[in-house]
């Protein structure tokens, strides 16, 4: 299994629709101002988060249970800047829609700009033949409110191509998050 380069990422995005919308180069400014970069890097693709957020709150004093998750634990927010409360988290989704090839596994890592501020991005791997918008989780590990900027870079996707195709892909087994288009809450 090997990590894939910028040339491969461009080819797969442009010819196979692996990433849409797609930025073939790293974008570092927008309308004259500096932004957290997004787009194609040497061995990865920096994704943006959309302006749709679900901010965790405990106003209902419920227990967080992944088998029986209460959607009331979140407050929906739409905007260019999301403020995450101290020691809390928010969910968002990528601007980009992904179509992962059958012989590729994609791993997501946080960007250092956010990590150096105590904001951690968590995403599970994008499995072979998974497709959809990626649900992102941002943890604010600080005792202060923290900002996340919509339509700017938030995480980097690394693509690993296997020497052979998997026997059963995410699509083959009917994965529960296949084709998700918005911020998706836990499912069992």
UniProtKB/Swiss-Prot annotation:
SUPFAM superfamilies in the record: dUTPase-like (SSF51283)
Gene3D superfamilies named among the record's database cross-references: 2.70.40.10
Pathway(s) annotated for this protein in UniProt: Pyrimidine metabolism; dUMP biosynthesis; dUMP from dCTP (dUTP route): step 1/2
Domain of life according to the entry: Bacteria
GO BP term (any one): nucleobase-containing small molecule interconversion
Active site: 137
Ribosomal protein found in the keyword field: no
Reaction(s) the record says it catalyses: dCTP + H2O + H(+) = dUTP + NH4(+)
EC identifiers of the protein: 3.5.4.13
Assigned keywords, A-Z: Hydrolase, Nucleotide metabolism, Nucleotide-binding
GO MF annotation terms: dCTP deaminase activity; nucleotide binding
Cited InterPro entries: dCTP_deaminase (IPR011962), dUTPase-like_sf (IPR036157), dUTPase_trimeric (IPR033704)
Pfam families: DCD
Extent of the signal sequence: none
UniProt keyword Nucleotide-binding present: yes
Binding site for dCTP: 111-116, 135-137, 156, 170, 180
Family recorded in the similarity comment: Belongs to the dCTP deaminase family.
Cited NCBIfam families: dCTP_deam
Function of the molecule: Catalyzes the deamination of dCTP to dUTP.
Subunit: Homotrimer.
Protein name as it appears in the record: dCTP deaminase
Classification lineage: Bacteria, Pseudomonadati, Pseudomonadota, Betaproteobacteria, Rhodocyclales
Gene: dcd
